[in-house]
């Protein structure tokens, strides 16, 4: 149990390591003795074990970054994410910066680092609460949809055989939608929709909530058309989007009763085209990141890179930022994700690079990256730590009730 009710980041510093700048809340750990690591033949990534442990209250995490140098090579510490409940020894993953990464193995023999050769920044971050991320479409505005039992050709409100009038709009919703004319009800591209509903933006009326009717679409006073990207609805509503003059709604099934889609005009909350947890996995209270799964099978040749695009957009709002980071288990194998900030209202995307000599393969739904959402901070690494530090004798004694414990070596999902 913590000795104080004030939220603090705890750190236990073992033999051969030191921590500096704790009072300034810019914690850096470094080696006070010569340290050694044994390279692996199948990856150029070097795993370096420290004797440092940390623990945080739920709702916080640590981003590890930094550099290292020995008499032969300059190294970069692969950015890693530490869960609040992890109490094991922190591990550092290093990649050489002055060599061509695709050369493959780190070579034979033991790699040594002299005293002071390793500097790792431990940046404490505050996380966006899970209930905000998970309910990123809930709101006060309502969009009544007409009852639509069948598909109507050329109807102004329901896109049936006449959906070609909105082909340009529909094609803009996701990069790989098929540019062909289909009859509803059928599945259209990757949206998983059988029915589409549309209304001209010029037909949208602005009224107070207490004057909402059942035959029109309303926008709350002061809201903008862009707010339709923030919505909550029954599961069969796959997306709500504004493109040009059209408001577009895609449904997995043709509705047999009146539906209600709630729209949000509060840009301080995240927004999504589909439910957040349909793309990002559920996480435990002590987890820092949300799992990102591969949308399809992929093989990366040695030195190869691929841009992964998810069928998801976010709007984090003021004072918040979301980043895609790699998973330590993949980083260790030499399959790296360069940390990248998610751009509001654009498709969530990121690069994966294989720096090994051998090809890398991942299957659809494999966990390949993670999303971390920051509160009151727009930069992933550096800056002032979100919590003050407290040096303790034993992190594991202070954090006895942690469900994560010492599983893994410090980064989420190992």
UniProtKB/Swiss-Prot annotation:
Keywords: Hydrolase, Magnesium, Metal-binding, Nucleotide metabolism. It is an enzyme of class 3 (hydrolase). The keyword ATP-binding does not apply. The keyword Zinc does not apply. One of its GO terms (biological process) is dUTP metabolic process. InterPro entries: dUTPase-like, dUTPase-like_sf, dUTPase_trimeric, HSV_DUT. Its EC number is 3.6.1.23. Its cofactor is Mg(2+). Substrate binds at residues 327-329, 409-410. GO terms for molecular function: dUTP diphosphatase activity; metal ion binding. It catalyses: dUTP + H2O = dUMP + diphosphate + H(+). It comes from the Viruses. Disulfide bonds: none annotated. Gene3D superfamilies: 2.70.40.10. HAMAP family: HSV_DUT. Involved in nucleotide metabolism: produces dUMP, the immediate precursor of thymidine nucleotides and decreases the intracellular concentration of dUTP to avoid uracil incorporation into viral DNA. Belongs to the dUTPase family. This is Deoxyuridine 5'-triphosphate nucleotidohydrolase. It comes from Psittacid herpesvirus 1 (isolate Amazon parrot/-/97-0001/1997).
